[in-house]
Structures are given as structure tokens and as C-alpha cells.
Amino acid sequence: MKRFKKLVSVLTLTAMLAASLTACGGKDPVAEDDSTAGTTTADSSTATTENSGDSTFTYAISGDPTETVNVITTSDRWGLSTVKMIYSPLYMNNADGINWFLATDYSVSDDNLTYTFKLRDDVKWSDGEPFTADDVVFTYEAMEQEDNLGWAYSQLVYDQGTVKVEKVDDYTVSFTFPFVTPTAIEMLSQIFIMPEHIYKDVTDFEHNDYNMNSVGTGPYKLVDYQSGSYLKFEANENYYKGEPSVKNIVFQIIENADTAILALQNGEVDAYQMTPQQVKKLDLDASNLTAYSYTEGRVGYLQFNCNRVTDENVRKALLFAMDRKAMDDAAFESDEYYSIPYTFLPTNSQFYTEDGVEKYEQDVDKAKSMLEEAGVSGLKLKLGYISSDAVQSAQALLIQEQLQEVGVTVELAGGDGTAIANAMKDPDNEYDMYLGGYIMGIDPDTFSSLFENDGAYNYMHYSGYDTIDQLFEEGRSEMDESARKETYAKLQAAVQDTGAFYPIISNNKILVVNNRIQGVEDAGLVPVYTFEDTSSLKIAE
């Protein structure tokens, strides 16, 4: 009998691929992690722990955060996981509400422009120096400098002006927006605070003497980093929530999935993220393991390049030819590991609705009829996807089969993730459609960079859908939540009516953990970072 626990995520995330200036501050998607099927085996030497002793938790990760890890520019999964070990944000804006860290409360001015936060007065940096509002002002102002390439730049700098950050007193800080917005709490969240007394003279946040000798307010201190091998952390005795009971945590870098799984089964590592297919092959009880499933608020999708597939009715016909549930079952075994979204929002969003939305449920006869009406026959399409991603590879094969049923030939053009992403940016790229996925923020406005006609990440390259832009504008300027829900219901329907975007899956992450590690539920499994607060982890006595 396999041991399996299902958790509800307490966070829907915010990380960025790059800094970009947009008119309304939509967030950018977190970089996809396509390394689970990697074939390169990293140096398997450990931080002389190999699960040695009861005081170490070893987590196998599939990528190297590198020595450039820092609060300002880091935006990849394992880099952000490292940042969260060392530093703390004011708060995290979760699907279930705010989870406070360095701040304790906030108030809003009568004109809805200024947000004032009270800070904890009992926090020390890991070097013993006191944490104050000066550190908060320093961090946010550094994030607002375009030359710093901060991942949160577009959350704080707008065409209308820059968010003004001011110290009220040592433990109070205010943020004044240049316009009224219901997304302010979202835009200010998830930004980790760095110490002014350490970084005040730094001009290059990626290359300096402090990143690998970091001083933070998080639960752990980074004490050793070996490129391509491991990162070792020690408990921060000054942590404001109390010194963590797990004294050492090691991020063991193992790029090859088979190597990592074998290490997990042998007790050499304590945790590893796995796919449903990988979990299915394990005897969890025999290996003393538990699998935890949790949502990341991720949406996997198919997009059309509208510069190549220009006819909206042809795009819709192709969507009616597809069966997303067959794709999902092929990749994730059963709906225990996923839900099906029918709009651009993840299903756990409070704004998600299927009312008035065209779902494009498979109807082969309708697809054939629509193609015939459009005068299309012998259509050939090129599908771009990440070839090392097992899920996308399975989806691509089924799309090829399903479209063949309506007389459409699909060329599978799998490639490197970075190369595919770079090609998608080019409006004149050679792909007719592409598979992808994103993790965005809580608020629907954070998706604007993906779906507005001139959005920085609108790789569908459509134009003329003015209603979409208008509805995004209405949503971001409306403070009443019920009115916003009505607006975003219309917006979800409008995006699906383009026939350019086909949401396929909102899949769970699976973390498999050795049963000697306790407190996983208390630590909270969340998107990207894995744990909301590693200080809650414990090791069985």
C-alpha cells in the first residue's frame, strides 16, 4: 500500500523570468524547470553528510543555483529556494491570505494610494545587527533601479510613476503608488529583504563577495557551496521565529532523475520532487517514504502563433479536434495529480470561473466541418516543445495523433527550453504552435503581460482583440471585488474566444520525503520554493 498525502498549497507565486517595464505592472512567469529528465549526472559527492546524523535534512535538487544567487535578480526555481532559506520577505500573499514574516500588519490611506506596514521589532540579521525599516527602503529602492535588472522592477515602476518607499520610523515603512490599484498587496509581496549594512556599496548584485557569505533574516545561513555538487546551510540562531530544530540542511545537486531516485531509496537523500510515473514505480512503504501532492497554481497550455495560424475559426476548429483529458492522463496517470483549467487562470484562483467560457470539448465532427467551411485542407503545422520535458513530449505526441484525425499533419519540433522560449519571442518565428506553462501571481492582473495585445510575454502575437485590453484595464482600476469578479469572468471568456490559447492542465507537484523527516505539513508545501518555512521541519527521534 503506497503512502500518499495530498496538501493544499498556501501560496500561488510571483517569480519573474526577467525585468520588463509594462504599463500596468503585470508580473512575469517563473522560469520552467525542464531538468527532471536530464541525462547529465552531477558530482554526487555530498557535504560530508550523506544523511549522516540526526541533525541533517538532505534535499536532492535538479539544478545548480550558482554563486550569483541574490535577492534582486534571482528568478529560477532553485535560486529562489536558496534565497528563501537565507532571507525573509515582509509577507507572502497566499491563495488563503497573507502569511506575515518581517511585517505584522498594514493600513491603507483614505485615498487608497499609500500602504503603511508595521515591522517586527525583534528581528536580527544573522550577524547580530538589528533589522529596521532602513533595510526595507534600501531593498525596494534597489529593486526600482532599472540598471539592477531586478525581477520585481515591473511591480514597482510604471509609466505613471514609481512606487515611493519611505521610512516612517525604525519599524514602520510606507509605500505610495502613483495610481489607485487593487493589486498593490500583490505587487509588494514576495520581495525578500537584504541588509543595507552589507550591500549598501554593492553595484553588481550577481557578482560580489557577499552572495556566498550571506547575512540574512531567514531560518538558515549558507555556510558552504560547491558548484555542481551541493549547498550546505546551518540553522540561524537569531531566527525571529526561534532557532530551527533541524540544525543542517543540504541541497544536494543531482541533475539525473534516476540517480536522485536511487539516492532517495537508499537513504542518501531525504527528499526529491518526482513525476507521477516515477512515484508509480516506487514501493513507498518498503523505502520508508511518503509522497506529498500539492498545487503550484501552474497552468500548462498550448498556444497558437497567430502570425502563422491567422484564421480564428481555423484555430478554434483545431481546438475542437483535441482531447486535453487524454493528454493529462497520459502524462499524469490519473486526475489525483491534476485538475483541468478551462481558462488562463489556475483552478484554485478565487477569480476562476467557467461561466460563459468556451471549453472546446473534443468534437471531431465539428472540427472537420469548421475546417471545411474555412476552405482548409492538407494543413501542416509545426509544434514547438521542450524535448527533455516528459510531460510536454507526451502531450505533443497526442496532439499529433488527434489532429491527424481531422486531416492535419503536425511536425514535432522538440528542442531546448531556452531556444524554444527565445524563438517564441520573435513574431516571425517558424512555429505554428507551442507547448508551455506558467506560474503567476494571485491577482488576475498579474497575467496581463501574457494576454494583452502588446503584452511583453504575449507569444501568441495576436492583435485587434481590444476587448481583452479594456477588461484588463477595468479590472486593475476597480476596487470592489465583486465587480472585479464580473470583469474577470468576461475577460476569461474573451481570451478563450480568440482560439489562440488552449489551457491543458493545472498539475500538482509531488515531493517524496523520507519518513524520518517530520513537520512537512507545518512547513507548508508551496510553489517554486518547496517549503513556506523550513524552520517547521523536524527529524524523528
Segments from the language model and where they lie:
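Structural transition elements
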Residues: 320, 336-373, 389-392
